[in-house]
Curated annotation (Swiss-Prot):
Keyword Protease: no
GO annotation, biological process: chromatin organization; IRE1-mediated unfolded protein response; regulation of transcription by RNA polymerase II
Similarity section: Belongs to the SPT20 family.
Record region (Disordered): 1-33, 223-273, 422-446, 519-604
Protein name: SAGA complex subunit SPT20
InterPro entries hit by this protein: Spt20 (IPR021950), Spt20-like_SEP (IPR046468)
Purpose of the protein: Component of the transcription coactivator SAGA complex. SAGA acts as a general cofactor required for essentially all RNA polymerase II transcription. At the promoters, SAGA is required for transcription pre-initiation complex (PIC) recruitment. It influences RNA polymerase II transcriptional activity through different activities such as TBP interaction (via core/TAF module) and promoter selectivity, interaction with transcription activators (via Tra1/SPT module), and chromatin modification through histone acetylation (via HAT module) and deubiquitination (via DUB module).
Length: 604
């Protein structure tokens, strides 16, 4: 770089431009890769900067077009994807609908055969139907005890080889009340309703709602031979019990000793190889309505079912328990009399002598305690209801009682009105006995007044009955009871606050309206006076007790300061004769009070 060249005017202050020609090395402003100089006009046209500007403008235009096209293509692709998804969904829905229609057509053309169910209802049929199934539970009978347990798993019961009593299961004695009740249910063929929850918790197997109980009688056993014995030995034996046919094992019985030593030897061999087996019975325990109800309650103990579940449950129970429900109406005996006997009918017949129909009834019973001997016995509702306040309160919610009370109230109104009218007529007669004309006039007036009073009383009673017998009376009675209860609580609180004893049990219950404001004011004034009197008495008592306490304290303090002086001994007074005087008796409290009362009365 030349030292004379100004720094501010030199655009290339950091050195010589790169790749410059040697002729242009000294020129400070020549750009990189500069071609040789040309005509300015041509240079303007073919200038590289102008070319680059024009190319950049063209490229920018093409770029903007491609961006718009890309956005449009993306939108088209999105629309195409959405359309393809919709078409796929439509095809799937059509396939599903087609499959459903196809299956429906198959069901209509080729109906499924109904499952044949073997309905049995009596106990023998149910036992025969489930004879190859395991029983629900077992009942073992021993000499001194009984046992209830779950069924054994093996076909050959363990109790057959070991008939002694084991500890598994519920062991009961002969005198147990639970055992007696259970045996009663077994004899009746009913499931005990008290063990429904236990059966559900123990997972006992039910068969069409029934329980199959297998009974083992260990007191009456039979000799059973195993299957390894020869057939000739088994052929000579005969079964001893026809009821014990639960297992296919042979029952060996000793034959009569008529054939000699060979038979006895065979019998002894059979006895050695056989073992004792208890007699086995099967019985059925059926449910009833109470056990079904307890079963439903046990299932609904911790869950609350909806109405639909309850209805479905009830329908299934009715289907299983009341399958042969007959809804046919019985024949009318009077329309189908020709199908019945003549003695089964007793029709009324016309008696020409009495000129009336005579109805033939059966003779009344003459047993003691029957209606034919005792007659009609009036019940509680047939007794006349007395319109007392207590009974009206106790029976205030009974509609029948209100009508009877209203009737008695109406009768009492009319009776009082007639008494008032009769008393007024008697007074008028006594005053006007001087002249007959005036007496006749007063009698007519009294009768007219009596009729008017009676009519007014009847109208008032009818009005009372109409107002007290409507539907609004029910609400008014409830309102009255609530108000009476509130007033009772208020009186109780007032009595407790004022230290007044509550009303005794035999006090008269007022059925009138609540107290008026004037009565409440008088009651408050009386309570205030009683409180003042009680307060003054308490204050006087407190003052007296305070004064006594202060005087006692002062005396005690003085006594503490001074030493205690010994009192001189009292010598017994002697009489003039020299003998000691008799001791005076102390007066009792009763005599003191009796002697003090007249003086107090005289002083007052």
């Amino acid at each position: 770089m030349s030292a004379n060249s100004p720094t501010g005017n030199d655009p290339h202050v950091f050195g010589i431009p790169v790749n410059a020609t040697p002729s242009n090395m000294g020129s400070p402003g020549s750009p990189v890769n500069v071609p040789p100089p040309m005509n300015p006009a041509v240079a303007n046209v073919n200038h590289p900067v102008m070319r680059t500007n024009s190319n950049s403008n063209a490229n920018e235009g093409t770029r903007t077009l491609t961006r718009e096209q890309i956005q449009q293509l993306q939108q088209r692709q999105r629309l195409l994807l959405q359309q393809r998804l919709l078409e796929q969904q439509r095809k799937q829905q059509a396939l599903q609908n087609y499959e459903a229609q196809f299956y429906q057509m198959l069901m209509t053309l080729n109906k499924r055969p109904k499952r044949l169910y073997n309905f049995v209802e009596d106990a023998d049929s149910i036992l025969k139907k489930y004879e190859q199934y395991l029983h629900s539970f077992e009942f073992h009978i021993y000499e001194n005890n009984y046992k209830i347990c779950a069924p054994a798993n093996s076909r050959l019961q363990q109790q057959q080889k070991q008939p002694e009593l084991t500890s598994d299961g519920l062991i009961l004695t002969k005198n147990n009340e639970t055992l007696k009740e259970f045996l009663e249910y077994v004899a009746r063929g009913r499931i005990p309703d008290a063990i429904m929850e236990v059966l559900r918790d123990c997972n006992i197997q039910f068969y069409e709602g029934n329980l199959i109980l297998q009974v083992y009688d260990h007191t009456n056993t039979v000799d059973v031979t195993p299957k390894e014995n020869k057939p000739n030995l088994n052929s000579s034996s005969s079964p001893s019990n026809n009821n014990s046919t639960q297992d296919n094992s042979k029952i060996q019985q000793p034959s009569e000793p008529n054939s000699g030593v060979a038979n006895t030897g065979a019998n002894t061999a059979n006895k050695k190889a056989s073992f004792k087996r208890p007699r086995v019975y099967r019985t059925l325990l059926k449910p009833n309505d109470l056990t079904t109800y307890y079963d439903m309650m046990s299932y609904a103990d911790n869950a609350r079912f909806s109405d639909s579940i309850y209805q479905q449950f009830e329908s299934e129970i009715l289907t299983l328990t009341k399958r042969n429900l007959s809804l046919s109406v019985p024949l009318n005996p009077y329309e189908h009399r020709d199908m019945l006997e003549e003695t089964a009918f007793s029709e009324p017949h016309w008696d020409s002598e009495k000129k009336s129909f005579i109805h033939e009834h059966r003779a009344e019973s003459t047993r003691e305690g029957t209606k034919g001997v005792v007659g009609h016995i009036e019940e509680r509702d047939e007794f006349p209801q007395h319109s007392s306040n207590y009974e009206q309160l106790m029976l205030i919610m009974n509609e029948r009682t209100t009508t009877i009370t209203n009737s008695t109230f109406a009768v009492s109104l009319t009776k009082n009105a007639m008494e008032i009218a009769s008393s007024s007529s008697n007074g008028v007669r006594g005053a006007s006995s001087s002249t007959s004309n005036s007496a006749s006039n007063t009698r007519n007036n009294s009768l007219a007044n009596g009729n008017q009073v009676a009519l007014a009383a009847a109208a008032a009673a009818a009005a009372v009955g109409s107002t007290m017998g409507n539907d609004n009376n029910q609400f008014s009675r409830l309102k009255f009871i609530e108000q009476w209860r509130i007033n009772k609580e208020k009186r109780k609180q007032q009595a407790l606050s004022a230290n007044i004893n509550p009303t005794p049990f035999n006090a008269r219950i007022s059925m009138t309206a609540p107290l008026t404001p004037q009565q409440q004011l008088l009651q408050r004034q009386q309570q205030a006076l009683e409180q003042q009197q009680n307060g003054g008495a308490m204050k006087n008592a407190n003052k007296r007790s305070g004064n006594n306490a202060t005087s006692n304290n002062n005396n005690n303090n003085n006594n503490l300061d001074k030493p205690k002086v010994k009192r001189p001994r009292k010598n017994a007074k002697k009489s003039e004769s020299g003998t000691p005087a008799p001791k005076k008796k102390r007066m009792t409290k009763k005599k003191q009070s009796a002697s003090s009362t007249p003086s107090s009365t005289t002083m007052s």
